[in-house]
């Protein structure tokens, strides 16, 4: 009898305390089983057989916790049966249901009336039945899935079968429809999606749109995750007015190289009855041992390709498509020296407008360039630049050009100022296939020009306070003198020289022409001053004002074909850039011809950006006898969830709209709707109107044509606010 009482007391202690049992091995290398802890209002069972817990049951094993009204645990096979308010919580998700059967060893079983929530995201779902198919593998029957918050079903996927692979963070739905506001907007027999932004092979959401040139468009991209370091996107593009085009993008990256290849191919344009294509290759390669290589190749089937079929507004304004290969070598020459060697192959595809034909640029086949510099050689700085170029052209005189430009300077510098006198000698030789000028009889020409410059400046500083902020204000006067004797160059060809835009930095350059074919004569001095406001705490430059005047002591005699100022006199330029306040920034410049006191150029822009997603831009550009344009653009929220977009580029000189954009965006908590229409003039002076409509279902898909790139290109400072 005493033995029986003792057994009953021990059994009572057993059922009143949490039970600790051993589970199956977690891994082949483990000889111990992970323990299980059970807490409940009442626990009953048989040792090594089964345990039943009733009332506020909490069962824990490792990082997995199960709560319910009633739980049966079968120790022999590690099965559990759960009834009433079942909840299974893991580190990355939570499952709810009415009835759960599950094997703790292999994580298989089923859950009735399941609900599902991802902890690391907004994904959630429910269904009629959930099958647990192993570690991190779920399969829902008659399922619904969304990323909207609880009690919000603005959009969802309704699927007969929904698989969720938590390890790969991929969902796969079969016989699925996407519903928006309970209206079916898309049906697919099969689809997969990522809820962790991982790359995966499969079809992406369809793209739909409408343009005045192509008509109604529908594209279905297929993403191919070939390897961790390269992938491809293949997109059939159906256009009601053009036919079916195939868009292809291939990307790759390695330890020493990266690049992207695009090929868009339309075998038969229904409008033109021709084959049309566009191609772009960008490749960058660190070859090692100081060598670097690059390829930039662009091509189109015809001059109207980008107007009719392009989806990048920047390309529509291009006349010459760059096609070049480049390689360079760099090494150091001791402590204060550098050596750079490079070679270049370059040509352009010119998209001619028959109404305004232009001369195609010369081909460079090839160019070899050598640059070397050695600093502080007995106080002197030596430098050398040389090149050998073969120019080619189908209609113009062409040939070889060789240049040498050695130079030496004496830099005298300290903490508050500098003086830099410099002397160089520019020598050029031409070997042409025919004389460049009818007045010349010689195909072998040369030119040698000495160049002298003297640069000097000082930096003065003082502490100041503006709007209760501490700044360092600088005053930096600068004097720059250049002397280049005149050399008659009318008989020389002009392969690549053009006059550089006049700006404040250009005041301190010896030469005013780019390229090597024209060396300007000069006897002029620049008097300039700049002032900067530098934030004392951060060291950031807040505002800069610069003004300078170039005074010419003699007439300019070397000119290009375009009208240019040749008389002695002076040019005045002033620029203001930086932040007027924390939220208002400006970039303004003005050029004044003091010979006739006329404004030659004005460039002014102001931007107001008080917060992300709030921006107002205004700009004005004027070049005498060339252009006068106004630019206005904005991105601004209104009401609670709406944003508006607008942009305009208008030519006052031609009384013509060059580009315009108008759009709206609605941002809900789990979806966004964008509508944008744009109108622009192409490089061939044709106009094009595009309409972008996109519905974005967060973390699932985008349906329609994405206007974000157009907004970024058109509205400086544009920022997405729905991320």
Swiss-Prot record:
Keywords, A to Z? Cell outer membrane, Membrane, Signal
Q: Name one Pfam family in it.
A: LptD_N
Query: Any signal peptide, and if so, which residues?
Result: 1-23
Gene3D superfamilies the UniProt entry points to: Lipopolysaccharide (LPS) transport protein A like domain (2.60.450.10)
Record has Membrane as a keyword: yes
GO CC terms in record: cell outer membrane; transporter complex
The record ties this protein, via HAMAP family, to:
LPS_assembly_LptD
Q: Of which family is this protein a member? A: Belongs to the LptD family.
Q: Tell me, how does this one assemble? A: Component of the lipopolysaccharide transport and assembly complex. Interacts with LptE and LptA.
Q: What does this protein do?
A: Together with LptE, is involved in the assembly of lipopolysaccharide (LPS) at the surface of the outer membrane.
The name this protein carries in UniProt is LPS-assembly protein LptD
């Amino acid at each position: 009898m005493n033995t029986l009482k003792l057994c009953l007391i021990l059994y009572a202690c057993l059922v009143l305390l949490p039970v600790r049992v051993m589970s199956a091995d977690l891994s082949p290398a483990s000889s111990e089983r992970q323990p299980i802890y059970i807490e409940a209002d009442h626990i009953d069972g048989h040792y090594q057989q089964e345990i039943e817990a009733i009332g506020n049951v909490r069962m824990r094993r490792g990082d997995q916790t199960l709560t319910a009204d009633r739980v049966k645990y079968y120790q022999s096979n590690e099965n559990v049966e759960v009834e009433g308010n079942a909840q299974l919580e893991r580190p990355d998700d939570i499952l709810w249901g009415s009835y759960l059967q599950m094997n703790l060893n292999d994580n298989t079983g089923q859950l009735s009336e399941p609900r599902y929530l991802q902890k690391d995201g907004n994904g959630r779902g429910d269904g009629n039945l959930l099958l647990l198919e192993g570690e991190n593998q779920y399969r829902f029957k008659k399922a619904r899935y969304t990323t909207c918050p609880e009690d919000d079903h603005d959009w969802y996927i309704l699927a007969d079968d929904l698989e969720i692979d938590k390890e790969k963070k991929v969902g796969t739905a079969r016989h699925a429809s996407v519903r928006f506001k309970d209206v079916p907007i898309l049906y697919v027999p099969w689809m997969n999606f990522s809820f962790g932004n991982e790359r995966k092979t499969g079809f992406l959401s369809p793209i739909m749109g409408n343009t005045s040139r192509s008509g109604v468009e529908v594209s279905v991209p297929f993403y191919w995750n070939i390897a961790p370091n390269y992938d491809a996107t293949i997109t059939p593009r159906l256009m009601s007015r053009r036919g079916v085009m195939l868009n292809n993008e291939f990307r790759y990256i390695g330890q020493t190289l990266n690049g992207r290849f695009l090929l868009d191919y339309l075998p038969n344009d229904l409008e033109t009855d021709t084959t049309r294509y566009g191609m772009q290759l960008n490749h960058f390669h660190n070859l090692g041992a100081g060598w670097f290589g690059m390829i930039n190749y662009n091509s189109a089937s015809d001059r109207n390709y980008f107007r009719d079929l392009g989806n990048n507004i920047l390309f529509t304004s291009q006349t010459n498509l760059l096609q070049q290969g480049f390689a360079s070598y760099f090494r150091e020459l001791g402590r204060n020296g550098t050596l750079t060697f490079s070679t270049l192959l370059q040509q352009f595809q010119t998209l001619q407008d028959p109404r305004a034909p232009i001369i195609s640029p010369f081909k460079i086949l090839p160019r070899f360039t050598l640059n070397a510099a050695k600093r502080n050689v007995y106080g002197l700085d030596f430098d050398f630049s040389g090149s050998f170029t073969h120019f080619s052209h189908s209609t113009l005189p062409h040939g070889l050009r060789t240049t040498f430009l050695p130079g030496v300077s004496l830099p005298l510098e300290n903490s508050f100022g500098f003086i830099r006198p410099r002397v160089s000698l520019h020598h050029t030789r031409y070997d042409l296939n025919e004389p460049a000028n009818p007045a010349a009889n010689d195909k072998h020409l040369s030119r040698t020009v000495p160049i002298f410059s003297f640069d000097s400046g000082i930096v003065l500083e003082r502490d100041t306070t503006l709007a209760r902020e501490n700044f360092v204000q600088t005053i930096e006067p600068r004097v720059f003198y250049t002397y280049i004797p005149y050399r008659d160059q009318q008989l020389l060809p002009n392969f690549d020289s053009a006059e550089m835009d006049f700006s404040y930095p250009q005041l301190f350059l010896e030469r005013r022409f780019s390229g090597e074919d024209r060396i300007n004569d000069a006897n002029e001095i620049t008097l300039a001053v700049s002032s900067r406001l530098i934030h004392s705490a951060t060291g950031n430059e807040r505002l800069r004002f610069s003004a300078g005047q170039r005074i010419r002591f003699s007439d300019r005699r070397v000119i290009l074909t375009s009208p240019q100022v040749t008389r002695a006199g002076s040019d005045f330029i002033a620029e203001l850039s930086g932040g007027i306040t924390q939220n208002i920034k400006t970039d303004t410049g003005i050029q004044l011809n003091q010979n006739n006191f006329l404004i030659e150029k004005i460039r002014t822009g102001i931007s107001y950006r008080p917060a992300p997603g709030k921006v107002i831009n205004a700009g004005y550009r004027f070049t005498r006898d060339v252009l006068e344009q106004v630019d206005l653009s904005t991105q601004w929220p209104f009401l609670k969830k709406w944003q508006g977009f607008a942009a305009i580029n208008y030519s006052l000189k031609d009384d013509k709209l060059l580009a315009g954009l108008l759009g709206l965006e609605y941002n809900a908590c789990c979806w966004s709707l964008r509508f944008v229409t744009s109108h622009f003039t192409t490089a061939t002076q044709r106009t094009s109107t595009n309409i972008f409509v996109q519905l974005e279902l967060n973390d699932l898909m985008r349906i329609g044509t994405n206007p974000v790139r157009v907004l970024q290109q058109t509205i400086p400072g544009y920022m997405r606010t729905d991320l």
